[in-house]
């Protein structure tokens, strides 16, 4: 799967786009990291790429199709997303939450078949949350909840996975483990995983490509550039 962006502008009003003139191509089989200051538009871009927000201008293609040509169900089979907001659900077990990731493939009543349950089991194992399987979502810590929502995205089995600061609530060892798992998944399962992050050192270590939002633009940057930025911050 390929995401192709041409002359793309994203935001809330055409007169004041958050990011404009985006020209970029991202291919499956890679972990791409989106970096930049708080409030600069990373979440807005991710929401546009998944169809939550309409594009303001330009072209946004998934494969060879414009994103606006997909039905909601079709799009849910192409792109999954994990946002930073807490899920507005309670009284569901972790296994049930992750099972909701199968909804694009289940029938009207949403019953999971044997093959769906295998996918759910695989997502739970991949994120290392077997011990949480029977817990209720409202009993989890922020970090545990984030792992569950990533597992739900994995269970959705989309070629494109978008993650908005997926390691924000994790301790450092868990952050590194999550980055490593996502990189391995992108490579071994031929997925395009795009995540926003402030963990620059981990982004440099694990990302196949680095994208920086700065002053209303999106540009590919090198690991050397990011390391220089880290040094500049430390030396202030």
Give the role of each language-model region.
Residues 58-66, 75:
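Conserved ABC transporter NBD signature motif
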Residues 1-5, 9-21, 89:
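A short, flexible loop at the N-terminus of ABC-type nucleotide-binding domains that lies
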Residues 136-140:
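Conserved ABC ATPase signature
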Residues 197-198:
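H-loop/switch region of ABC-family ATPase nucleotide-binding domains
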Residues 161-164:
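Catalytic Walker B motif of ABC-type/P-loop ATPase nucleotide-binding domains
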Residues 50:
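Helix-to-loop junction immediately C-terminal to a conserved catalytic motif
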Residues 35-37:
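The feature captures the beta-strand-to-loop junction immediately N-terminal to the Walker
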